[in-house]
Regions:
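Conserved PLP-enzyme active-site core in the AAT-like
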Residues: 1-169
Length: 174
């Protein structure tokens, strides 16, 4: 997706290119029109909803449907959906990732990510994670648990602030 988180774009443009893998970016509001971007060699449809830069929400079910019709795996960066507000696997996404640093940990003192997959892709995800040496230290796990204890309170405050912001914006435009 075109509004993808900058380090993800850099990964595609700098590292994947070196491995002979090409990336095609598409507008986040493409929806079912994603079929026009799928090529015979497309392996993964990467979504980010809401998007990091513009907060645009993608039509995930429509895009997953098209991807499935073309035998393309779907992966969604669910950092802002955080698993409580949006559950990608329930909408057909194959792999969901998120930066645990943001909402799960919540204190910016741990660098951590989370990946979950459906039954089809879980064995591959688990094995590749192991082969790449990805693991969490005991200290980071402890700090993540600390963040989980306050996550509900923090997200409730985020929600209240967002509603107030929208209400205030509507009043100022009336």
């Amino acid at each position: 997706v075109d509004n993808v988180y900058e380090p993800t774009r850099d990964f595609c443009d700098k590292i994947l290119v070196g491995l002979g893998i090409t990336t095609t970016y598409y507008p986040p509001t493409t929806g079912a029109g994603i079929k026009d971007y799928i090529q015979p060699n497309t392996k993964v449809l990467f979504l980010e909803s809401p998007g990091s830069i513009t907060m645009e929400v993608q039509d995930v079910p429509a895009m997953v449907k098209v991807a499935n019709e073309h035998n393309v795996m779907t992966m969604l960066d669910n950092t802002y959906g955080n698993g409580l507000h949006y559950r990608p696997l329930e909408h057909g996404v194959d792999i969901s990732i998120q930066a645990a640093t943001k909402y799960i940990v919540g204190h910016s003192d741990v660098m951590m990510g989370v990946a979950v997959a459906n039954k089809k892709y879980w064995p591959t995800l688990r094995e590749n994670s192991y082969l790449l040496g990805q693991c969490t230290s005991a200290d980071d796990a402890y700090l993540a648990l600390r963040g989980l204890r306050t996550m509900g309170v923090r997200l409730n405050q985020h929600e209240k602030a967002a509603i107030k912001s929208k209400t205030d914006a509507k009043k100022s435009h009336s």
